[in-house]
Amino acid sequence: MPRPRSLSGWTMAVFGLLAASLGTVGLAAPDALVAVMGLAPIPGARRAAGDHTTMFLTASSMAALNMGVYYLLAALADWRPFFRWTVPFRLLTCAVFTSAVLVGRAPEALLGVGAWEGLGAVVTGLALRHERRRPGGGPLDRAVPAS
């Protein structure tokens, strides 16, 4: 079975596996995903008419599954430019989710998701920096997906 070939690849693989797993849980059992986030699930029978929560859970779960698969494939190809591109966007996600909680637009449970994104970005960024500084590391742009 293929495995990531670099420290930064491993950070991406772990993040990808978690994202794909949580996306799958959200598609198969949305209330279980809500509970994992520390929120109280509301059974479908008690939802108000016009409540589109399950639609948004389905959409975000599908996005998480897709993103997780992209991250896993990039990790297996050791596609470091992709790893580098994710760092600022994951930091942005952390900032947006944290801000949403601070202004009262989202429950505190979203802080965990923001922290996960922020920590993942920092760990991946540090791994990329370490790899670039070691002998023979060279520019990250040299790394291209394996054929």
In which residue ranges do the predicted regions lie?
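Membrane-water interface at the C-terminal end of transmembrane alpha helices
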Residues: 118-142, 147
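Membrane-helix boundary connector in multi-pass membrane proteins
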Residues: 76, 82-85, 95-113
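Core segments of alpha-helical transmembrane spans in multipass integral membrane proteins
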Residues: 17-27, 43-75, 87-95
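Cytosolic juxtamembrane helix and N-cap/initiation of the first transmembrane helix
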Residues: 1-19
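Transmembrane-helix signature of multi-pass solute transporters
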Residues: 21, 95-99, 119-123
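Alpha-helical transmembrane segments and their juxtamembrane interfaces
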Residues: 74, 100, 127-130
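Short membrane-interface helical motifs at transmembrane helix boundaries
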Residues: 27-43
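Residue-level micro-sites within transmembrane alpha helices that shape
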Residues: 89, 116-118
